């Protein structure tokens, strides 16, 4: 009966965090709107080989992540849940691997369940795992690869070892097809310290070639297909998306070496109090093969991405699978022997919740700020934000009431965040970051437009997805579409600021022309260097400007 109760609790936990509240959150631009529109266009066109965004070639990522996203929208429709269904599925599959791997290492069902709950409730896992980007997919393939390698190295027969390495190659191949060649580098770096300390080089060299073969065979069909359709894809993807993005002086998302320290700290909530003890206990028990493997899995990717010039929090998502297992193992030891770390964890969550409550008041309409985040008419959103932090502090306090038994309720600290964050976003944020909100407010004006132009790729993708049309024209700025716009068949999909007046005269009689611009909050629309418009509708950071036929 206890096992049944645990399973019911786990399913309720997943429903409250990963299923029920997802539709209440509008899509964020630029990331979610971009991937939503790429997958919508894939379904609409039936082209499952070459990715397109706004009808233009889009070579920033390979294809596999878009396949999964497209299946999500095909199954659940073009809605918020359908867009995020793929990443949620990948996150839950990763959690299932955490369960399986923990059971494999320690043969303890309670520990396996705890590791799963810790993983799913980690702030960084939840934030990224319910956000429609490709990182949950690559995290799943990396975690699957690490599990496959362990399975192969623990097998006692040549058939078992061969199967494990073949599976490793498939996971690496799918990782390459999801986000590129980092799916090869990260697993290799992660296992090398373990291979060295356990002196398992022989197995690696004897069977490793099977992983190489299965990886190549996994990528080859699509790799050849896109090379035939778009011969310059691999050159662009390898040089621009890998070398320039991570290594060169002009790398994207440049950040200092220590960048991931605060990411690890914030990402470990609501289990931050377990982080030092989990790592220390893991290091102290480094003579144990499994512990070394988990430590290497956690630390090596962190070091690799810290050295790289380009950094984003999402890059280290796969590290938190192994970290969750280390935390769960340490938590049970602490509960049994010395619950000090569990008490500290409770106080950290209380402090975080109280700090959030105070910060919410400071930026609320009743706080001391001259320009509050929320306006007076958004009072219910302020109370939603207060509820988020109040629940966080409450469950932090509850874990202290009988710490040896109640410490695991820290998993419920983010419950308010999961259920209420979609209702607490300020209008001033929604107007700039949620194109769906803008479309809803201006639907009647946008729908009959013959041409729609915008100066933001994220807004363009949001407009395209919401209006179910991929002919949005870029105005003044090309952004990440620069490469696709260079193709001859993309002529007419970009209008510069200097050309706009002439372009308007040439196309005005064809129908309503709508210009959607991103502006500063205090920017005077009348100062924009554009021809006089027939209608203007400003929604804070986004403004709709229309020209009708004359």
From Swiss-Prot:
It holds the Pfam family PMT. GO terms for cellular component: plasma membrane. It is found in: Cell inner membrane. It catalyses: 4-amino-4-deoxy-alpha-L-arabinopyranosyl di-trans,octa-cis-undecaprenyl phosphate + lipid IVA = lipid IIA + di-trans,octa-cis-undecaprenyl phosphate. Its EC number is 2.4.2.43. Keywords: Cell inner membrane, Cell membrane, Glycosyltransferase, Lipid A biosynthesis, Lipid biosynthesis, Lipid metabolism, Lipopolysaccharide biosynthesis, Membrane, Transferase, Transmembrane, Transmembrane helix. One of its GO terms (molecular function) is mannosyltransferase activity. InterPro entries: ArnT_tfrase, Glyco_trans_39/83, LipidA_mod_glycosyltrf_83. Pathway: Lipopolysaccharide metabolism; 4-amino-4-deoxy-beta-L-arabinose-lipid A biosynthesis. Catalyzes the transfer of the L-Ara4N moiety of the glycolipid undecaprenyl phosphate-alpha-L-Ara4N to lipid A. The modified arabinose is attached to lipid A and is required for resistance to polymyxin and cationic antimicrobial peptides. Belongs to the glycosyltransferase 83 family. This is Undecaprenyl phosphate-alpha-4-amino-4-deoxy-L-arabinose arabinosyl transferase. It comes from Escherichia coli O7:K1 (strain IAI39 / ExPEC).
